Regions:
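Alpha-helical transmembrane segments of multipass membrane proteins
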Residues: 35, 39, 79-87, 120, ...
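Membrane-interface junctions at transmembrane-helix termini in multi-pass inner-membrane proteins
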Residues: 114-145, 161
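Interfacial segments at transmembrane-helix termini and the short loops linking adjacent helices
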Residues: 22-23, 62-63, 88-118, 165
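Interfacial transmembrane-helix starts/ends
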Residues: 29, 61-77, 85-89, 107-110
Length: 176
């Protein structure tokens, strides 16, 4: 399962390099390092969830599982708001970070990256709960289809738009 998730979410740089051009990876990395860090923190916070859900399921604590899931959704909403604040100040942050080498920040690309990141966090929350409940077969089929869909959407989208953000959007759409 970890390999399937890696293929779905960690091949964007490779796809950008193949379908858009290696120079576009630099722009993607700036957005990823700033906005993607929020999804990374959320994913890190999920580390104990899988085993906690398994334990609660064995102990027949369905209400506790539902409550934990609602808290996860609430955390996604909170992180989503943090992303919006980050997108608002991102031009200033990038200029401070990179100085005169700074890229021109696109708020549209930033917002699309936020949507991708929300989908990523939602998917990781559901992944951890599904695995904790022993639904690994269902999740592995779903992730495999999403991985194939991601490649197809990326190929089509980049043939039309030739932008790194197309790869990010394709990944979000495929993961839904």
């Amino acid at each position: 399962l970890q390999i399937i998730i890696m293929v779905l979410f960690n091949v964007k740089e490779l796809y950008i390099s193949w379908f858009v051009g290696a120079e576009a990876v630099v722009d993607y990395q700036i957005y990823y390092k700033l906005i993607g860090m929020i999804g990374g923190l959320f994913s890190l916070a999920l580390n104990p969830v899988w085993s906690a859900v398994t334990k609660a399921l064995v102990e027949k604590k369905e209400q506790w599982i539902r409550g934990l899931y609602r808290k996860g959704i609430g955390l996604i909403a909170l992180f989503g708001l943090a992303q919006l604040v980050l997108v608002a100040v991102m031009p200033m942050v990038v200029k401070l970070w990179l100085g005169e080498n700074a890229i021109e920040v696109s708020r549209v690309a930033g917002l699309l990256f936020c949507v991708y990141n929300l989908v990523y966090m939602w998917m990781m929350l559901n992944y951890n709960f599904a695995c904790g409940m022993g639904r690994t077969k269902v999740i592995s089929i779903w992730l495999t289809v999403a991985g194939a869909g991601n490649l197809l959407l990326t190929m089509w989208g980049c043939s039309v738009y030739r932008s790194w953000i197309t790869v990010v959007v394709a990944t979000a759409v495929a993961a839904i």
